[in-house]
Every structure is written in structure tokens, then in C-alpha cells.
């Protein structure tokens, strides 16, 4: 008989999925955030003028969301 409790999905997820972010991750995140903020600000202004109301997310929240989505893609490659 084999022991199926050795490599349970819980242990596999802990071993591969959750690593502590390193300084390099935070540097890339900051660079992407600072580079994305002017673009998000301009698009926020254009959207405000076109629709004559404020968007749901502000420019900083939009840049934060983009940096949060893009940075992990760099480290997965």
C-alpha cells in the first residue's frame, strides 16, 4: 500500500505557491507604479471630461491595480 497523505494538495500549495516577496519584487512594483501613474492620471482626466463624472477608481488606485497585476507576470516568466 502507498501512503497518499505525504503529498497532499495542502502541502504542495505551501511548497510552491507562497513565497515571501523579495526586495527585487518591490523595486519592480515601485518602478511600474511610478511609470503607470502619469498614464493613469491622464486617462482619469480624459475619462472625467468625456463622461462628465468621476471614475470609480482614482488615478493612484488605477496605477496600483495595474502594477499589482503586471509585476507578478514579470516574475512568472
Curated annotation (Swiss-Prot):
Question: What does the similarity note say?
Answer: Belongs to the PufQ family.
What the protein does comes down to: Required for bacteriochlorophyll biosynthesis. Directly involved in the assembly of both the B875 and B800-850 pigment-protein complexes.
Keyword terms, alphabetized:
Bacteriochlorophyll biosynthesis, Chlorophyll biosynthesis, Photosynthesis
InterPro entries in alphabetical order = PufQ_cyt-su
- Biological processes per GO annotation: bacteriochlorophyll biosynthetic process; photosynthesis
Which Cys pairs are S-S linked? none
Protein name, UniProt field: Protein PufQ
Amino acid at each position: 500500500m502507498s501512503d497518499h497523505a505525504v503529498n497532499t494538495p495542502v502541502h504542495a500549495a505551501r511548497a510552491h505557491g507562497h513565497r515571501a516577496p523579495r526586495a527585487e519584487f518591490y523595486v519592480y512594483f515601485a518602478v511600474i507604479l511610478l511609470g503607470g501613474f502619469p498614464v493613469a492620471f491622464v486617462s482619469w482626466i480624459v475619462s472625467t471630461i468625456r463622461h462628465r463624472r468621476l471614475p470609480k477608481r482614482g488615478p493612484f488606485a488605477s496605477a496600483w491595480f495595474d502594477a499589482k497585476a503586471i509585476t507578478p507576470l514579470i516574475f512568472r516568466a
